[in-house]
Swiss-Prot record:
Gene3D superfamilies: 6.10.140.140, Classic Zinc Finger. Predominant expression in testis. A zinc finger (C2H2-type) spans 222-244, 250-272, 278-300, 306-328, 334-356, 362-384, 390-412, 418-440, 446-468, 474-496, 502-524, 530-552, 558-580, 586-608, 614-636, 642-664, 670-692, 698-720, 726-748. GO terms for biological process: regulation of transcription by RNA polymerase II. This is Zinc finger protein 184. SUPFAM superfamilies: beta-beta-alpha zinc fingers, KRAB domain (Kruppel-associated box). It comes from Homo sapiens (Human). Residues 191-212 are annotated as: Disordered. It is found in: Nucleus. The modification Phosphoserine is found at residues 117, 122, 199.
């Protein structure tokens, strides 16, 4: 910026002070400081000249608004913001050369004419020569080319015009002058932007100017000392230098954010006001900036004017092309000062820096969770709303984020474009490859501040931290159960929906979880390399062998904190805990009965369908449950390996022994909440509870009669089948019920 003590600045300050003088009769409007172009004249401007016109015009408008001299938005401002051409149909006055308006934009200042009334204002340019500063005169007259203009310029190098009267078509410079408090910008508003009627000589001069106007390209004499870039005009150089100095003189009063350009401040302030003046005719969407509307409209038109010379890929925005080209060049101009990591895109660089600062400015109103990126917040909010906008055409599954949808789609295509150079393993996502490569290096850069545990992945650390905080922000809308991880909630929801999206391509078996499918697929491809030394049973995974060996060792490392009962497997403990919590998430659609395990629901459904898939090879009898078949088969072998220590009675199943031992101990652990009656077996409690609810879930397929207990249904079905399974060993008579056999046996002597 120039020193305010310079002759130029003194002149401009003098003009500024005239604003408050008593003799200033008319306020400055935007019409006083605008240059109009015809379509033909506009085409003569090169891109640099058009950019300069846009920048200066928008800047002038900003300053007029800031001091209260402009209220409504002129059409030319809207045109410039939207990126359209701001030429007029018929010019009211002739305009000089293309260089003419540029010089006037930067240098034009006029002497005050306070006695001219509004009626006397004219849209004509009157140039009367009066004495002023040498350099100012030279710059002003430089662009006016008409007959004899070069000679006149040479003659006036040492003599300055005494007075310059500037009309509504002349724009003053805003680069110099006193500081405007609202914008923090050096602003000068000339108070003498008035007009008067042209003289005949002036009219003749204007005609001569129009007839002899030819575009003259100005030499790029203003050079940047930092990078060597040259500009035709010093105002453009001043704006460019802000990229080196970091100067941001335009400050927002709402949030204190500063900008290097005034038009950027205007656009930013619309964030606070919510003003979106640029509306799309196709979909009605509003935008803060005109260029944003232009870019958006290409979505509807499909226009992609920016094409990559390397690969031919086209883009709707020039910035996207620039970013894309860095893929070919490998350029990464944005480097982090903290860790030295480089990025090809500024947005990625800004997001990365939040890792070091810990900044998470985007907060969810529902659960108060914060995020480093607005896109992450938007995707997260869909968890609460249930919105799933991305639908797979293959299987119909919907997703709330594009990245999740893309990853899912690779399941159908089998695409795994990211391959490890060490072991050749391929992945469908680049992030998975990056994580996998740490298994070769052993790198664990993420440490827990609570316990010091290290992790290879940041996501693993984030999940681990929830163990310390106990945070469970993801809640199921069906049953209210909460989870620490979004993925756990997604998997849990499949319990309610019965969804099994992961199907084995070999045998067609479907699974609710991808991990289960991966494990299952190993049964087709992998050998069972892990063999039990006790019984010789082989397993695909070492973890499965370790679990199996607990059968032989009797190890039960998982203990219930409620009752102290121990279990061999963690899954068994989880299922057991549901007894204490009363949780029964698996509900039958036929009768509404709920179960705490999915397998119990599957077995229960066979009551309604009548399915008995387990058949005895000895006698052909079929059973609903595999365990029932196993129990039945022991009647053929007479095997009863489980003996009671009290009475030496033997049983074919350990569960029967456990139930029998309660006769000796009197233990009745299953208590009814309604009447406090206790039972030694859970099945007895379940059947008893039906007496309170009146529920009769067991239905006869023959006569549709219902029963509260399964044993009653079994006994009833013998009426239809004629089955009499209880035979007397003495006389061979058979009975439908065991109680009837017991009564009959009393008739024989010695019983």
């Amino acid at each position: 910026m120039e020193d305010l003590s310079s002759p130029d600045s003194t002149l401009l300050q003098g003009g500024h002070n005239l604003l408050s003088s008593a003799s200033f009769q008319e306020a400055v409007t935007f019409k006083d400081v605008i240059v109009d172009f015809t379509q033909e004249e506009w085409k003569q401007l090169d891109p640099g000249q058009r950019d300069l016109f846009r920048d200066v015009t928008l800047e002038n408008y900003t300053h007029l608004v800031s001091i209260g001299l402009q209220v409504s938005k002129p059409d030319v401002i809207s045109q410039l913001e939207q990126g359209t051409e701001p030429w007029i149909m018929e010019p009211s006055i002739p305009v000089g050369t293309c260089a003419d308006w540029e010089t006037r934009l930067e240098n034009s200042v006029s002497a005050p004419e306070p006695d001219i009334s509004e009626e006397e204002l004219s849209p004509e340019v009157i140039v009367e020569k009066h004495k002023r500063d040498d350099s100012w005169s030279s710059n002003l007259l430089e662009s006016w080319e008409y007959e004899g203009s070069l000679e006149r310029q040479q003659a006036n190098q040492q003599t300055l015009p005494k007075e310059i009267k500037v009309t509504e078509k002349t724009i003053p410079s805003w680069e110099k002058g006193p500081v405007n408090n609202e914008f923090g910008k050096s602003v000068n508003v000339s108070s003498n932007l008035v007009t008067q009627e042209p003289s005949p000589e002036e009219t003749s001069t204007k005609r001569s100017i129009k007839q002899n106007s030819n575009p003259v390209k100005k030499e790029k004499s203003c050079k940047c000392n930092e990078c060597g870039k040259a500009f035709s005009y010093c105002s453009a150089l001043i704006r460019h230098q802000r990229t080196h100095t970091g100067e941001k003189p335009y400050k927002c009063n709402e949030c204190e954010k500063a900008f290097s350009r005034s038009e950027n401040l205007i656009n930013h302030q619309r964030i606070h006001t919510g003003d979106k003046p640029y509306k799309c005719d196709q979909c009605g969407k509003g935008f803060i900036e005109g260029p944003s509307l232009t870019q958006h409209q290409r979505i509807h038109t499909g226009e992609k004017p920016y094409k990559c010379d390397e690969c031919g890929k086209a883009f709707s925005q020039r910035t996207h092309l620039v970013q894309h080209q860095r893929i070919h060049t490998g350029e990464k101009p944005y480097t982090c000062n903290e860790c030295g990591k480089a990025f090809s895109q500024r947005g990625h660089f800004m997001e990365h820096q939040k890792i070091h600062t810990g900044e998470k400015p985007f907060k969810c109103d529902e659960c108060d969770k914060t995020f480093t990126r607005s896109t992450h917040l938007t995707q997260h909010q869909k968890i609460h709303t249930g919105e799933k906008t991305y639908k797979c055409n293959e299987c119909g599954k919907a997703f709330n984020g594009p990245s999740t949808f893309i990853r899912h789609h690779m399941i159908h295509t089998g695409e795994k474009p990211y391959e490890c150079n060490e072991c050749g393993k391929a992945f469908s996502q680049h992030s998975n490859l990056t994580q996998h490569q740490k298994t070769h290096t052993g790198e664990k850069p993420y440490d827990c501040a609570e316990c010091g545990k290290s992790f290879s992945y940041w996501s693993s650390l984030a999940q681990h931290l929830k163990i310390h905080t106990g945070e469970k922000p993801y809640k199921c809308n069906e049953c209210g159960k909460a989870f620490s991880y979004c993925s756990s909630l997604t998997q849990h929801r499949r319990i309610h929906t019965r969804e099994k999206p992961f199907e084995c391509s070999e045998c067609g078996k479907a699974f609710s979880y991808l991990s289960n499918l991966n494990q299952h697929q190993k049964t087709h491809t992998q050998e069972k390399a892990y063999e039990c030394k006790e019984c010789g049973k082989a397993f695909i995974r070492s973890s499965s062998l370790a679990k199996h060996e607990r059968i032989h060792t009797g190890e039960k490392p998982y203990q219930c904190h409620e009752c102290g009962k121990t279990f061999s497997y963690g899954s068994s403990l989880i299922q057991h805990r549901k007894i204490h919590t009363g949780e029964r998430p698996y509900k039958c659609n036929e009768c509404g009965r709920a179960f705490n395990q999915n397998i119990h629901l599957t077995q229960h459904k066979r009551i309604h369908t009548g399915a008995k898939p387990y058949e005895c090879a000895e006698c052909g009898k079929a059973f609903r449950h595999c365990s029932s078949l196993a129990q039945h088969q022991k009647t053929h072998t007479e095997e009863k390996p489980y003996q009671c220590n009290k009475c030496e009675k033997t049983f074919s199943q350990s569960s029967h022994l456990t139930q029998h031992q309660r006769i000796h101990t009197g233990e009745k652990p299953y208590k009814c909440n309604e009447c406090d009656k206790a039972f030694s077996r859970s099945t007895h409690l379940t059947e008893h509870q039906n007496t309170h609810t009146g529920e009769k879930p067991y239905n006869c397929n023959e006569c549709r009669k219902t029963f509260s207990q399964s044993t009653y249904l079994i006994q009833h079905q013998r009426i239809h089948s004629g089955e009499k399974p209880f035979g007397c060993n003495d006389c061979g008579k058979s009975f439908r019920y065991r109680s009837a056999l017991n009564k009959h046996q009393r008739l024989h002597p010695g019983i």
